[in-house]
Amino acid sequence: MYRLAALVGLLLAPAAHAAEPARPNIVWIVVDDMSANFSCYGEKLIRTPHVDKLAAEGTRFSKAFVTAPVCSPCRSALITGCYQTTIGAHHHRSGRGELKITLPGDVVPAPVLFQKAGYYTCIGGFQATGDKLGKTDYNFEWDRTMYDGNDWAGRKPGQPFFMQVQLHGGKYRGQGPNANWQNRVKKELGANTDPAAVVLPPYYPRDPVILQDWADYLDCCRYTDKEVGDVVARLEKEKLLDNTVVFFMTDHGISHARGKQFLYDEGTHVPFVVRGPGIAKGATRDDLIEHIDLTATSLALAGIDVPKWMQGRNVLAKDYAKRDAVFAARDRCDETMEHIRSVRTDRFKYIRNYMNQRPHLQPCRYKDEKAIVQKLRDLHAAKKLDDLTEKLLFAETRPAEELYDLAADPHEVTNLAADPKHKATLEALRKKLAEWEESTGDRGRTPEPMAMYDSDMKVYLGGGKKDNTELKRNIELNKTWAKEGK
């Protein structure tokens, strides 16, 4: 059973400092593997009162998107306020072997900037026990000393703090339906979500395994909501809440066949809520923002100058210029090589598949260990999937370009790239994406050196007690495809 020991510690820690600092405390609540399935975002099947309250007492952003739909590139981008493709941190879990990645130029992680300004920096929650920090998952070399600890209780009297609370989120359900999680939900939340009541996207079959997994995922959202309430309750108990800006967001969407790792809204659209002094109450912002904007916004709220190299923007600034588009990138995930880019406006999404000769569901041990993916592959082999699911998930190749009218097609199932009526939109977004790749110095335009790939794969092959037969097969397949230009 998963434990969030550090979060419990957050609740039990004594109120160390009665006097509040003049500068606001900054708290990021960052959740793993979760889309915007909260009632304040329109989810009907479950109730999430604590996140809803946070939104009611603050500002909810309805169109927040991550620049990477998988943990480590997303978190590398977030902690620097830069696109992961600009800083060379775009491949998932890269730089973990003998070959390392260093940040370019003057770029430094945000905690360094907070420390220089006198803030106590800490990262707790999931993975934080004893002196161990909460989840970081950065794809570059960084200094442990940029964090003073894993809980704000260690700060000096009157010292403001920058705290990240990492929550397990969608990962609580594991790789598939399991009784341990379901029993824990029933014990702590009183009841489980009914799989029969689940509403799935149109491209997922209403199979019992897939329905149960989605119900378990919604219970992860409910449990996350409870944990958010626990964090806020401690701030209130210690009389810190009135001088603390609390941000709530997730690192990408639900882990599913078209969610995590992919650039559809299922993988990139995330909740983003902020509450605190000076923040508009009960407000909803419908303009497009990127998750790296959190970094610049937080620095500005703390009275810290936002560095010129930072690509995120202060979305609360009086002179803030709203984005007309947001961008995202998918590159290698674990052993699976990939290169996809996207640009999204209010109405349209353009996706460029640079490795379109490969299937959508490429072999990937992490993905293929999931019960839902195994079930989808079984149904595909038995020819029991409908035409839409077959086309979207199991076509042997993909279109080089995808274009979706999100107003008419929110699930992104009708590709308009070849439609003459949308030629002007296609060309405009194609150009916009190319300009972004050039202006931001997208490092994904150059293939990852095979030496770096091999260095990281040694880590994968050497870790844990898993049978690596499938992983070795996938690595060799990826190398073969790369040699063939596929």
Question: What residues fall within each predicted segment?
Answer:
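A short beta-strand-to-alpha-helix junction
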Residues: 22, 42-48, 65-70, 99-107, ...
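A long, amphipathic alpha-helix that forms part
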Residues: 191-244, 301
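Active-site segment of extracytoplasmic enzymes that catalyze sulfate/phosphate-ester chemistry
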Residues: 28, 35-108, 113, 119
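Long, internal low-complexity/basic segments
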Residues: 18-24, 31, 36, 60, ...
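Active-site regions of oxyanion-processing enzymes, predominantly non-cytosolic
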Residues: 19-25, 78, 139-201, 236-247, ...
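Histidine-centered active-site microenvironments of extracellular/periplasmic hydrolases
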Residues: 46, 236-290, 307-311, 328-329, ...
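Polar, surface-exposed loop/tail segments
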Residues: 49, 78, 126, 131-141, ...
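C-terminal cap/loop subdomain of S1 sulfatases and analogous C-terminal strand-loop tails that border
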Residues: 295, 302-402
